[in-house]
Amino acid sequence: MIKNFLGLIIFLIIQVISLDNAFAFNDHNVREFLDERENLWPELYLPNFKFSNTSKDLIYPNWFEGNWLVTSQDLEDDSQAPVIYKVNFFKNNLNEVIGNRSKNSESIGKAIFGDTLIKVVNDPKSINKQITYLKDDLYIDSRITGRNQIKDDDMFFADELVIQTLHKPGASRVNQVETISKFQKCNRHNSNSENTLKPNICGFQYIATYGSKVGDPLVHSIKTSKFKLSFEFIES
């Protein structure tokens, strides 16, 4: 009985060690994948998410929790004024910090589309589906098909691929959009804020669009953009 019990304990310990090693291995491979995507920009092709896990939402470092004022500058077009919007991140029932997807999407949409945007609605049955309603009977159906991110308390580094279908009376148009996001706490010389509640967050987003050829690994990006983002903590 004791031997069996000890054998079970040893087996469980080995299993835990094996799982930890597996997670570390996967995280290392995901980091390599993300580094490669960033280095390839702007010569991007449709990503192949070998370690994609769309069953879980993106998880952010704890220092993301709260409300933020974001300033996004298009580095490819200096003539464009910065886009400014508010975003929110909160802890779910697993004590993980996640983004308020519908609220954040609506805030970004309002900053870009103005009054043309009516509302953004999450699919209650899936964290990967969202519908954006616009004026003139237009709406955009968004579905995330790939997601990779590393686990790092000092950095948020992730890649998502979404299929967007624009529906309008009598026609629809499909587009695939990849978003690579890399954020960390700002260095003091990179931050213009004197906010002492939380340090600012700095980083970049790389956007690539691939058109309507879904699943074709040979598809090259049609358009790429790079944005510099800064997050300033606000209390409401």
Spell out what each predicted region is:
Residues 1-24:
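Classical Sec-dependent N-terminal signal peptides that target proteins to the secretory pathway
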Residues 10, 26, 138-140:
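Short secondary-structure boundary segments
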Residues 90-146:
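Surface-exposed, polar helix/loop patches in the mature regions of secreted/periplasmic/lumenal proteins
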Residues 124-218:
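Short helix-loop boundary/capping segments
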